[in-house]
Amino acid sequence: PGYYNKNACKKIEEICLTFPEKEGMVQDTKTGKINDTINKVRRSKVRFINLQDGDFLGSHELYTELTNLIAKINKDFFHFDIKGLDSIQYTEYDGSYKGHYDWHTDWNWSNPMNPPRKLSMTIQLTDGSEYEGGDFEIAHDIEPGYEPTKQLGTVIVFPSFMPHKVAPVTAGLRKSLVVWFTGPKFK
């Protein structure tokens, strides 16, 4: 079983669904500008959990929980200088439109964000039996078909500079929570 149980995943989803839905977008690596017309790279629906919009159903507690979780994971595995949380994004990839996100990094080296994203976290909110396709892959690490990444409640954390992707969902609906943690530039 994953780190989060079914009830915890349902609670996370309830919090996320109180925020407005948007089309997933891609940042142009040359200009740094948001490009919402790149469908071949990314097709998804997203909701950003923004504390400035208010505390809906416990979004403040969710921020606290995720911050505490990354502190433990970072201490045990990465030892990065983490100072904050960039944002929380709830993402849906639907088989009806072949939802996907092709190879990308969460850190843009040619147009660095300030502060830079250092660790990326994804939490699986849908059990793999509820959709087809949609494999989460990390270059040179997690390969297609690695079943533990599809277990409900699974948490995956990796350096934001590592290329990763979500393969097209061919049937059903894949839901996940993505969180980016920031800190000073790498030395």
Where do the model's predicted regions map?
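Non-heme Fe(II)/2-oxoglutarate
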Residues: P1-F78
